[in-house]
């Protein structure tokens, strides 16, 4: 069997294979806190990759989607005393609502103009959060997002324990992977790829370009909002920097490291970036310079990303 045919046969099962890897990942990853961060940041990059990798829209405003979800979850839990599951649902919904608002204003622009509009709107949300001290904590962040124990189907889960917390987060990430797989396998997934490859031809085929872009942005916001909610529960705090433009840059970096337009690439990129950050920061306070150099080298020598290059090698 040709390798490309073998990969094609595995594609319908990619969500199951990715989920299996995430389930066994803690067995050979000794640092469980980093493993949880990889899950959350990978989910954030996955949301960005849906828009950039599969539709070709470069956004510099995805920090607003992550931060919107994180703040919504934190406010619901801290200010209103709601249970964790309402916090997570609120965070996911908030990410979609923020994306709907930003997308409605940005989707009719193109290229660098689209990126700049998303950046500007995201920075507006950052300054709103910075000033709304009573709700967001301002520059000190929203503290007290404490979820120590969770009762699920009569079973008490102590998510203070690192391994339990990992699988708690992994359950939502795995669900997101299956949702993404269904989206990509649907007619809408085919429409996204058609628009990315040739917008003029896609319009001639009857696709509503603006509506498709807006819907993709909203779906991307759902994944990012979920990541933000999980991050708020994991950290117990929502730093205002979550909304800052540098957070959007991390999504871009992790996606390009792993492989733009690949299913599991965002998690590979998140793992490489976070492990590099953890190791290099032990050696020098200038770790960002070295990690940036590694990123540039990867982009130059592996333009398809690490995971994308591996898949391309198997397809030959």
What is each PLM-predicted segment?
Residues 121-158, 189, 307-309:
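Extracellular/periplasmic helix-loop junction at the C-terminal end of a transmembrane helix
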Residues 160-239:
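Helix-loop-helix "hairpin" substructures at the membrane interface of multi-pass membrane proteins
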């Amino acid at each position: 069997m040709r390798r490309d045919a073998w990969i094609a046969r595995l594609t319908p099962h990619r969500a199951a294979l990715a989920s299996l890897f995430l389930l066994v990942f803690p067995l050979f990853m000794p640092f469980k806190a980093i493993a949880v961060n990889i899950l959350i940041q990978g989910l954030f990059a996955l949301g960005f990759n849906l828009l950039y990798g599969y539709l070709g829209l470069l956004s510099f405003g995805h920090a607003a989607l992550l931060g919107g979800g994180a703040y919504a979850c934190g406010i619901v839990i801290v200010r209103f005393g709601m249970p964790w599951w309402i916090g997570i649902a609120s965070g996911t919904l908030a990410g979609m609502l923020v994306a709907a608002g930003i997308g409605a204003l940005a989707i009719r622009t193109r290229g660098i103009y689209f990126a700049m509009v998303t950046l500007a709107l995201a920075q507006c949300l950052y300054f709103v959060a910075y000033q709304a001290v009573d709700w967001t904590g301002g520059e000190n962040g929203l503290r007290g997002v404490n979820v120590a124990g969770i009762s699920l189907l009569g079973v008490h889960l102590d998510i203070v324990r690192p391994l339990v917390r990992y699988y708690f987060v992994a359950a939502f990430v795995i669900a997101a992977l299956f949702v993404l797989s269904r989206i990509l396998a649907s007619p809408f997934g085919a429409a996204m790829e058609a628009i990315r490859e040739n917008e003029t031809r896609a319009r001639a085929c009857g696709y509503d370009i603006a509506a498709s872009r807006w819907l993709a942005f909203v779906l991307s916001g759902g994944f990012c909002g979920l990541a933000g909610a999980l991050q708020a529960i994991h950290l117990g705090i929502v730093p205002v920097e979550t909304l800052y433009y540098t957070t959007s840059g991390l999504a871009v970096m992790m996606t390009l490291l792993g492989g733009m337009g690949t299913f599991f690439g965002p998690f590979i990129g998140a793992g490489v970036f976070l492990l590099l950050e953890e190791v290099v920061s032990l050696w020098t306070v200038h770790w960002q310079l070295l990690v940036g150099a590694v990123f540039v080298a990867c982009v130059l020598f592996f333009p398809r990303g690490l995971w994308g290059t591996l898949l391309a090698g198997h397809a030959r």
